[in-house]
Amino acid sequence: MSISSLELQIQTLPDNPGVYQYYDKDGKILYVGKAKNLKKRVSSYFNKVHDTAKTNVLVKKIVTIKHIVVPTETDALLLENNLIKTLQPRYNILLRDDKTYPWICIKKEPFSRLFPTRKMVKDGSEYFGPYTSFKTVSVILDLIKELYPLRSCNFDLSQKNIENYKFKVCLEYHIGNCKGACEGLETLENYQTQINAIREILKGNFKDSMKDFKKVMTNLAQNMHFEEAQKIKEKIEILENYQSRSTIINPKITNIDVFSIVSDEAAAFINFLQISHGSIIRSHTLEIKKKLDETDQELLELAIVELRERFQLLSREIIVPFEVEVGENIKVTVPQLGDKKQILELSVRNAKFYRIEQLKQLQIVDPERHVNRIMAQMKKDLRLSVEPRHIECFDNSNIQGTNPVAACVVFKDGKPSKKDYRHFNIKTVEGPNDFASMEEVVYRRYKRLLDENQPLPNLIIIDGGKGQLSSALKIIDELDLRGKIAIIGIAKRLEELFYPGDSIPLYLDKKSETLKIIQQLRNEAHRFGITFHRDKRSKAALNSSIETIPGIGEKTMLTLIKHFKSVKRLKLAKEKEISDLIGISKAKKITDFYSKLDN
């Protein structure tokens, strides 16, 4: 793969958190890294000469860049750690040990203990995390202990042992950190109530507990214990930023494969995540070109079989967005809520980003092919006889019947051609009449193009639905252009398109590029028209205001209108700025006039 191909991969990376992976020409993993912004981080490797020889050698070997997009920077850190341990990249020397991030464990036992750990034991205990720093773990545990006195001993507090007085209370009991469950001084029911509250805190549901923490802080401050109150305040701030759950590592999800699909008119993009022991260990996205009108279900089933065979996947459960048929021995899960739904959404996110990147790459490498593809798709979607290489869209701007104007925007090859934009002052229509206004501007536009022998558009889009379409069509017939130019109307609901002589609208897929371009056309026509209307109103207001100033003639008035464009800007202008334009005497008249008006 050439350098240009590598640059192309970098240019189309997303500006999102994630993990990037570098591969050499033989497909061997070189390096795994995390990023708050994938594009910026990866670009930094190639934009400078590095201080260390090792990094310079690494950069020279990179041929392929892969990445996984994740929701947060914390998730990126966790995924990086996990992939480094799984893939053992050559250049991640410092992170190739067995270090894992800490968890908080609620031990499955009578009078459950709460403690940090790096190892997970499958004995029914509950684990929360992982956390990216032990400081966060310590703060959470300290705050919990402020509210909930729990035992710290490792005694076997069975009912029998307690009844036989096998244990004695320790110093923790005497200083108030424990309620003496070992001697039966606290009931299991009361202790369990505390554990339930702690469980909610660790899940991130700590609204009620936060009130209690703040109450402790307030009491300390009222009793003049300001240093202790400040420490509690700092801990609360850390807790407020605490992320209770990671999408990347979840002990409840064991060995499962996740498949999702994002498709358009030409292709489908299937993302695959492999989950092993609660962690993502592989991500891959496959593109399948459509031959016929294959459904997403057909394409996803095909991809699942292909990917399971390619990567020799043996998991007995798969997570998918809808039901699929892939064999009797595989459990198919379509999650609606919870952890599995979150991991499916992560897969969908990566499929979407991959599709965007592929389209960007095509646009950079072969812009003509990219345009041809879009034009062919628009021709098919809109049932046109020719590709809509030249589109014009009309919009009326008529607010409260004042200063009626209209706008015509032009797109060529799917892109705005701003030099061809035109706006119109409505000349022949009195009062608010959108239908008559549309007739006027369509007539003026195409009568002029015909008189000047200018090229006509392939498609006219009328913003306003059936009524506006009928008005425009009347003029198209009058100019003998019916059949020479295609014309459609857009209803208020953007996905509804109306055609001449057809009362039933055409509905476009909300994901289609055709609809996106039509939406862009309408938004641009609306923006262009509103801007012109606003400027016209401002000039009218300025004109009206200046006309009332004694000693200011028409020529001076036009000079001021051309320069300031609005009353507000004229009022705020310094006298010197005005005098430089029209002379000291007239400038004084204007500033005195507005000064008296304000007073």
Swiss-Prot record:
It comes from the Bacteria. It is found in: Cytoplasm. Coiled coil: none annotated. The keyword Cytoplasm applies. Residues 15-93 form the GIY-YIG domain. InterPro entries: GIY-YIG_endonuc, GIY-YIG_endonuc_sf, GIY-YIG_UvrC_Cho, RuvA_2-like, UVR_dom_sf, UvrABC_protein_C, UvrC, UvrC_RNase_H_dom. One of its GO terms (cellular component) is excinuclease repair complex. GO terms for molecular function: DNA binding; excinuclease ABC activity. Transmembrane segments: none annotated. Residues 207-242 form the UVR domain. It holds the Pfam family UvrC_RNaseH_dom. One of its GO terms (biological process) is nucleotide-excision repair. Keywords: Cytoplasm, DNA damage, DNA excision, DNA repair, Excision nuclease, SOS response. Signal peptide: none annotated. SMART domains: GIYc. Interacts with UvrB in an incision complex. NCBIfam families: uvrC. The UvrABC repair system catalyzes the recognition and processing of DNA lesions. UvrC both incises the 5' and 3' sides of the lesion. The N-terminal half is responsible for the 3' incision and the C-terminal half is responsible for the 5' incision. Belongs to the UvrC family. This is UvrABC system protein C.
